[in-house]
């Protein structure tokens, strides 16, 4: 009896974990972006932001093209424009800024994958007083690698434990040529000037990204 109860508990826990990584398409904090045959849905997990506080999203990448695409799922950055009140969360790498290739996840043709990303709100220098410049909107930007041909061997090498793949000049050039930045619609947010108490994941060290596979072929 105890064994059966354990199995049921594990199944329920696994189901809850899977549900947590899905984008709620009915959530008012859902954003959408589409560039040709790549669609991205994202759900902002906070409606109130604060300085040094967390910002996190669940996002789904759907590849509607006939070729495989890839995303550097462990790379994220946060930028704040005080003039426009826009905070931008950028996911993936627009350029290869390091000497090692970032972790890449491939999305095959016809496939959907879901990830988590986030970081720490920073750059809000004047958050108090009548002339405070604080975020009023969040825009999510996702960088997608449209052509993975030049990175196939590198991606395969990354599957080995503790693998480190050096960036070559050809990789750098192909990345610039193949990268596509997809902007999702902006989402309104509130701002809190209350101090942050809990530690959060930084943009340079994002939390673990999870990918859920659905109907896609080999790439």
Residue ranges and their predicted role:
Residues 45-47, 101-107, 129:
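Beta-strand-rich interaction surfaces with strong enrichment in secreted/lumenal proteins
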Residues 52-58:
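Short, solvent-exposed loop/turn segments enriched in Ser/Thr/Gly
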């Amino acid at each position: 009896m105890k064994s059966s109860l354990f199995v049921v508990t594990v199944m329920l826990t696994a189901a809850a974990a899977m549900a947590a990584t899905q984008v709620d398409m009915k959530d008012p904090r859902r954003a959408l972006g589409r560039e040709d045959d790549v669609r991205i849905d994202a759900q902002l997990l906070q409606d109130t932001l604060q300085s040094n506080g967390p910002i996190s999203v669940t996002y789904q990448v759907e590849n509607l093209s006939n070729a495989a695409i890839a995303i550097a799922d462990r790379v994220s950055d946060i930028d704040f424009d005080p003039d426009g009140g826009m905070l931008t969360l950028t996911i993936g790498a627009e350029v290869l800024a390091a000497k090692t290739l970032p972790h890449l996840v491939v999305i095959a043709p016809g496939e959907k994958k879901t990830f988590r990303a986030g970081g720490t709100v920073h750059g809000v220098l004047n958050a108090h007083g009548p002339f405070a410049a604080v975020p009023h909107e969040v825009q999510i930007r996702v960088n997608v690698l449209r052509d993975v041909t030049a990175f196939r061997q590198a991606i395969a090498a990354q599957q080995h434990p503790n693998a480190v793949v050096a960036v070559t000049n050809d990789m750098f050039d192909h990345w610039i040529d193949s990268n596509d930045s997809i902007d999702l619609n902006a989402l309104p947010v509130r701002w809190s000037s209350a101090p942050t108490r809990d530690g959060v994941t930084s943009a340079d060290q994002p939390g673990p990204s999870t990918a859920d596979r659905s109907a896609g072929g080999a790439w």
